[in-house]
């Protein structure tokens, strides 16, 4: 059998001189607001994507103008933690160097900027560098931002878990100096042709993106099973002793292509804390060497495990790590939501979790969220923690400072809004107008859609029940819709596929119930199901489990076989 032809991106990476390409030349060109096609792939490794305003696309075409190009830049913030001083720097960039004048908290515990003209990219990256922040490997075929449960209660355990997440992020960063040379004006050194430039990645990096998360049970806010590689903390007497390792999760799929599917990770066993780096590097290098480099739609680790088999993959990881997995330790995986309002930590410090709808931090009439966080940052002595539910925690507040912090939060609309259980458990991706992959609205439409869900729950007397609802504009799954009890995935303008049946805890995927339907049909379907749920549910039964038990959808046990079947 002849060897399959490599995907174009593989040649681009090989010929890029370790991610340099012609990015510098493209940056210096004022002829266009765009980069070349090849460099558009390479800039992802530097932390940003080229986009354009799709609302204006047709109008500009009629005017014989090129699309209104701009860039989305995503920062690397392992565990989502930054200082108040860093936040002030982040805020200033949004206010002065982006057309969106906003900050977007993401579903991977970091922030991103939208509406950056090409001419401002270098200034922004240099300004971030002054705050000890960067966007290296926030996108691209590398290990992305490492998530970690921000657990504001078990402060000591969080600190230990966060240290592991930070070490993972640092250890698995690309070694190339391309970022420093292009954006920070570091003098280029003579590059070598051997693999010592990238001892872990090599010249072609990974076949596809690679996502990693650290969970601290019982919380599963990081949706650990949706990640390529997950570490579920195991504690004894409040001390971290190791992790249950999971591998092979991922949300992305392609409409109409059944060989692509979302998947939850497999459990592989327990590892000691001191062996985390060995196993992380082993899993990642197996994916580097075994992953599909011909078809990018089948390049994620989940497909590598499916294609090669669980046992073969496990044996290879153990061989490369030089350590065997121990039997998985029993842990309880629970809520994926955030604890809103004030929570006291074991150290006596207080933590205020603020709900940020769809993660968009912007000043609006009656809700000056951006100004509010800026004012809090000016006086706060603790840290800011971004959550994977797109919210913000003002962490480490002394008891005597609570009233001042709360007063500012209420003054600027960061506190005091009516927040139902379901709204508090719901997230959406950005989608239109900036995401080039979006087929339908998400962030702009989602608040209105949740209003309808809230009204239906109130109608049937089930408002007390949290339901995990997620919406994306396409099936790439940035807001993890396939792990939602109610998942809506864009198919066309105003039309979505409706998915039901995921577990509340994030341990089972959902399954498509209705295809390509509009709002009225979605709400009518949910109206009927909520009515049944109100009278037929068992005590303590969640909505996702109910839809499976009564046969609305079948449980997805093995995604490769039954997600589409």
Swiss-Prot record:
GO biological process, one term: sulfate assimilation
UniProt-annotated binding residues for siroheme: 478
E.C. numbers: 1.8.1.2
GO molecular function: 4 iron, 4 sulfur cluster binding; heme binding; metal ion binding; NADP binding; sulfite reductase (ferredoxin) activity; sulfite reductase (NADPH) activity
Swiss-Prot/TrEMBL catalytic activity: hydrogen sulfide + 3 NADP(+) + 3 H2O = sulfite + 3 NADPH + 4 H(+)
SUPFAM superfamilies reported for this sequence: Nitrite and sulphite reductase 4Fe-4S domain-like (SSF56014), Nitrite/Sulfite reductase N-terminal domain-like (SSF55124)
Binding site for [4Fe-4S] cluster: 429, 435, 474, 478
Pathway: Sulfur metabolism; hydrogen sulfide biosynthesis; hydrogen sulfide from sulfite (NADPH route): step 1/1
GO CC list: sulfite reductase complex (NADPH)
Function, as annotated: Component of the sulfite reductase complex that catalyzes the 6-electron reduction of sulfite to sulfide. This is one of several activities required for the biosynthesis of L-cysteine from sulfate.
NCBIfam families for this protein: CysI (TIGR02041), PRK13504.1 (NF010029)
Protein name: Sulfite reductase [NADPH] hemoprotein beta-component
């Amino acid at each position: 059998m002849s060897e399959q032809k490599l995907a174009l991106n593989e040649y681009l990476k090989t010929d890029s001189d370790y991610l340099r390409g012609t990015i510098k030349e493209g940056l210096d060109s004022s002829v266009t607001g765009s980069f070349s096609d090849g460099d558009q792939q390479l800039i992802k490794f530097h932390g940003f994507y080229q986009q354009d305003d799709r609302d204006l696309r047709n109008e500009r075409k009629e005017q014989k103008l090129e699309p209104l190009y701009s860039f989305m830049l995503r920062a690397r913030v392992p565990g989502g933690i930054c200082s108040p001083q860093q936040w002030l720097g982040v805020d200033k960039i949004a206010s002065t160097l982006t057309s969106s004048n906003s900050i977007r908290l993401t579903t991977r515990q970091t922030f991103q900027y939208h509406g950056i003209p090409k001419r401002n990219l270098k200034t922004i990256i240099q300004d971030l560098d002054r705050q000890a922040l960067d966007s290296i490997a926030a996108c691209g075929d590398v290990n992305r931002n490492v998530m970690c449960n921000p657990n504001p209660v078990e402060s000591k355990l969080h600190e230990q878990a966060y240290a592991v997440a930070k070490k993972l992020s640092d250890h698995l960063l690309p070694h190339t100096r391309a970022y420093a040379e292009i954006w920070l004006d570091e003098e280029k050194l003579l590059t070598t042709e051997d693999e010592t430039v990238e001892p872990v990645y090599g010249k072609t990096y990974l076949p596809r993106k690679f996502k990693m998360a650290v969970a601290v049970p019982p919380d599963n806010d990081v949706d650990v099973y949706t990640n390529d590689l997950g570490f579920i903390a195991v504690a004894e007497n409040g001390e971290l002793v190791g992790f249950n390792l999971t591998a092979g999760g991922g949300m992305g799929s392609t409409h109409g292509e059944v060989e692509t599917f979302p998947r939850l990770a497999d459990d592989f066993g327990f590892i000691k804390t001191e062996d985390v780096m060995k196993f992380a590097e082993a899993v990642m290098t197996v994916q580097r060497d075994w992953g599909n480099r011909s078809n990018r739609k089948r390049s994620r680790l989940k497909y590598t495990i499916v294609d090669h088999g669980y046992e073969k993959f496990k044996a290879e990881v153990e061989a490369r790590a030089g350590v065997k997995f121990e039997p998985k330790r029993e842990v309880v995986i629970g809520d994926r939501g955030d604890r809103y309002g004030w929570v006291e930590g074991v150290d006596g410090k207080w933590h205020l979790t603020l709900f940020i709808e769809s993660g968009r931090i912007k000043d609006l009439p009656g809700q000056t969220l951006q100004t509010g966080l800026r004012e809090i940052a000016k006086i706060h002595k603790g840290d800011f923690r971004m959550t994977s539910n797109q919210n913000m925690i003002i962490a480490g507040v002394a008891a005597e400072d609570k009233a001042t912090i709360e007063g500012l939060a209420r003054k600027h609309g960061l506190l005091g809004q009516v927040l139902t259980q379901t709204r508090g458990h719901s997230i959406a991706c950005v989608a239109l107008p900036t995401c080039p992959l979006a087929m339908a609205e998400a962030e702009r439409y989602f608040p209105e859609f949740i209003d309808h869900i809230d009204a239906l729950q109130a109608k049937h007397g089930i408002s007390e029940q949290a339901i995990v609802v997620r919406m994306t504009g396409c099936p790439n799954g940035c807001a993890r819709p396939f792990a939602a009890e109610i998942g809506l995935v864009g198919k066309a303008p105003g039309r979505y596929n409706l998915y039901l049946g995921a577990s509340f805890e994030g341990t089972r995927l959902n399954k498509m119930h209705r295809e390509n339907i509009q709002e009225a049909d979605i709400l009518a379907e949910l109206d009927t199901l909520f009515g049944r749920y109100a009278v037929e549910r068992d005590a303590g039964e969640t909505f996702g489990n109910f839809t499976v038990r009564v046969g609305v959808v079948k449980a997805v046990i093995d995604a490769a076989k039954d997600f589409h079947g």
